[in-house]
Amino acid sequence: MAAILFCRSQPKPMRGLDLKQNELFSYTTLEQRIPNDHPLRPLRGLVDTVLASMDRDFDGLYSTLGRASIAPERLLRASLLQVIYTIRSERQLVEQIDFNLLFRWFVGLSMDERMWDHSTFSQNRDRLFNQDVARLFFQRIKSLAAWSEYASNEHFSVDGTLIDAWASHKSFIKKDGGDPPEDGTRNPDADFKGEKRSNATHQSTSDPEARLARKSNGDASRLAHMAHTMMEHRNGLIVDVECTEFNGRAEVEAALEMLERTAKPGSTVGADKNYDQKRFVQRARELKVTPHVAQKRKGSAIDGRTTRHPGYAASQKIRKRIEEGFGWLKTVGGLRKTKLIGRAKLSAQLLLGF
């Protein structure tokens, strides 16, 4: 009896109870849930400033008839989240925004607002997620007052990389009426040994704008598009982007187009040996841009008048950082292989990614 009384007199452990009780009311806001030092806070402020400056541009994209659509600002913020958090698909993006309070706050949804369907992105792709809107967004970011504090406007580097297309070798058939391989299954076997295949005679049925490409002699050929970037040298920020088909002239032509659009007279541009061509060097000098290209062993388009300066050595050292942007794009940005068909859509995705 004494033992029983002793047990009953033991203090109760102060352990919380695992009660599953849904609260009817919430006395907090999304704003209170997000830490003041969260890295998305300054990004949200920057994005809101840019989107506010595009208000009149958005008005021109929508009809005056019918019911109101989902705000374009929310769709673009959601697309940025997809890039930043490496979300594989728009279906997954919608699911995560629905239950993630941080994502809801960034997009501009309240805790009670219903999330839209994933097909909304496809329905708005031609209107909102196109090259023109993406480039306008990109240019407005560069026009912010704070941009000049981080980015140089005098020293740049250019380079290109391959982005795998959403197409397989089996879709690469003859242009004169060839048929894809068939064996009665959804994924038929195909043997291309001994067959000469080139972009002049073959074309992909999945993505007609993709080209059979390889970046170097030891690289495997695959269907791809080319992405080109221009990086400033102060902090390694990407200041311009182009998307082209793969051919022997694409890198030089895209680089010159970006120089015409971005570089001012008196600038320098670093590049690898592929840009050590008379056409690139001559046109860069016509734009009053000094070409700090890596020299070929034979037949270089530049000489000691360019390479003797300390700035040339600095450009050759810093230009290699442009590969970091490509690495980020293909890993975090999820663009090692695009899920979109055509260069126009890929170009918009590249601009939002950088």
PLM feature spans:
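Phosphate-backbone recognition surface of nucleic-acid-processing proteins
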Residues: 104-122, 291-293, 299-314
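Hydrophobic, well-ordered secondary-structure elements that form the walls
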Residues: 78, 93, 117, 229, ...
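Polybasic low-complexity intrinsically disordered regions
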Residues: 98, 107-283, 351
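Secondary-structure capping and boundary motifs in well-ordered enzyme cores
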Residues: 35, 39, 66-74, 89, ...
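Basic, amphipathic alpha-helical segments enriched in Lys/Arg and hydrophobic/aromatic residues
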Residues: 312-354
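Basic, low-complexity intrinsically disordered segments
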Residues: 13-18, 28, 43-150, 165
